[in-house]
Amino acid sequence: MADGLNRVHFNPSTAQLVEFALLRGEGELTANGALVAKTGARSGRSPGDRFIVREPSSEAEIEWGPVNQAFDPGAFEGLWARVEAYLADKELFVSDLEVGADTEHYQPVRVTTQYAWHQLFARNLFIIPEEFNRKDKPVWQIINAPDFVCDPARDGTNSDATVILNFAERKVLLAGLKYAGEMKKSMFSVQNFLLPAQGVLPMHCSANVGKDGDTTLFFGLSGTGKTTLSADPKRFLIGDDEHGWAPGGVFNIEGGCYAKCIDLSQKNEPVIWDAIRFGTVLENVVMDKHRVPNYKDSSLTENTRAAYPLEHIAQRKEDNCGAEPHAVVFLTCDVSGVLPPVSILTKEQAAYHFLSGYTAKVGSTEIGSTSAIQSTFSTCFGAPFFPRPAGVYAELLMKRIESFGSQVYLVNTGWTGGPHGVGKRFDIPTTRAIVDAIVSGELKDVETVHLDTLNLAVPVAVSGVDSNLLNPINTWGDKALYAEYAQKLAEAFTKNFAKYQVSDAIRNAGPKA
């Protein structure tokens, strides 16, 4: 894309990008100063349109299938060239950014976008380095052309839009998509492929650190509480979604947060609330006539979002890094109402539940989801983003846990007293009290009760939590019905886990069907 043929804005500031977005009709300002943009029909990720170029350098290391769909190298070259030609006479926005807040494990990336608000999103979510690419690594390229219309017959895509990763050429192509989350998740997938070869575990998790330097990780799918629980006024945020765990410490892969906004309240989520101001991008958030965001309005999508830089959070770890974690929390949203609010896991149970990734899609981030809430097993708590076989990541997790001695907990942010529609969801204050007990060390070496069917150890008391909530059978009026649902869930775990080749110790660490 030659600079002389179009107007190219290099490393534009936040204020410039907001001005461009408003002048070009890409969005509107809200009363709190944020820029709100709409993404149209695709208000979430499009997993059916995501591909990886099948080429010799990476072919043998990728787990090909419905998640990692193969794309022909020649077809990619043709489509990349067509998109470049399409953008040749367009006004463009370009930034040199980095992915990975670690001096050894970062990846430099040049992001070219057709929309100003997409560039603002990229500058909020990726890292703006003081000095770009200090180690002179080969630079990745992202091109995002949302107004380009793909032709499946001509381009080899599945629809009029696509996301394609090319590891050999270090290129990411996004075409026909306005949903900005595709940009951040594409580079997350890149790091998820590259980091294991460097002995680093990439993780779909949030992370924070206490005043004494103790790090806690929160794994979970979108909507299970990663962002909410890591944004703790008593602790310092490292990041809310993507991290690497290397020998010696953890680091944020990003430079910002991408928080779900549905039902956001100042009372329950003050850190996120205060971060939404000038420079923040709001996706698909509805405003009233006074331009005040209505976070309860899901008329455009359940998957409303706020994208803001970490600088918008007062209590944050400024280097985006932390020590190795003392506590690791697996967040599961159990729609059956069977799992306890907190369980203490052995390292074998940690491997079992990491591979299982049992949870729910809560206001799914994927387009085409027919139900707002549905149970799912998502390997590594992020199956759509991990190109390598699941065992690679599970082995790295076990290695890191054993090496450092981290304690792993399973925390249910879903339902109790009955399944979704009958029981009630654990409220945020209850889950926060549980997390407080975890990070304080209160739950180490405590008295527990064993739930035989689920094969889980549950503490008999947690400060600030009604003890009746801790054993889920106590919250069900019909105890026999609870036992029936628990057995069904155990059978679902066993059926899902049958595909994994693991040791007997790990297999036997799961529920007992």
Curated annotation (Swiss-Prot):
Alphabetized UniProt keyword annotations: ATP-binding, Cytoplasm, Decarboxylase, Gluconeogenesis, Lyase, Manganese, Metal-binding, Nucleotide-binding
Cofactor entry: Mn(2+)
The residues that hold Mn(2+) are: 185, 204, 241
A GO cellular-component term linked to this record:
cytosol
For the protein in the UniProt heading, the enzyme class is: lyase
Do you know which SUPFAM superfamilies this protein is assigned to? PEP carboxykinase N-terminal domain, PEP carboxykinase-like
**Co-factor: note:** Binds 1 Mn(2+) ion per subunit.
Query: The organism sits in which domain of life?
Result: Bacteria
- The answer to whether UniProt assigns keyword Plastid to this entry is no
Question: Binding positions for ATP?
Answer: 185, 204, 220-228, 269, 305, 431
- Record GO terms (molecular function): ATP binding; metal ion binding; phosphoenolpyruvate carboxykinase (ATP) activity
* Enzyme Commission number(s) from the entry: 4.1.1.49
Where it sits in the cell: the answer is: Cytoplasm
Q: In which pathway does it act?
A: Carbohydrate biosynthesis; gluconeogenesis
Query: What does the similarity note say?
Result: Belongs to the phosphoenolpyruvate carboxykinase (ATP) family.
Identify this protein by name.
Phosphoenolpyruvate carboxykinase (ATP)
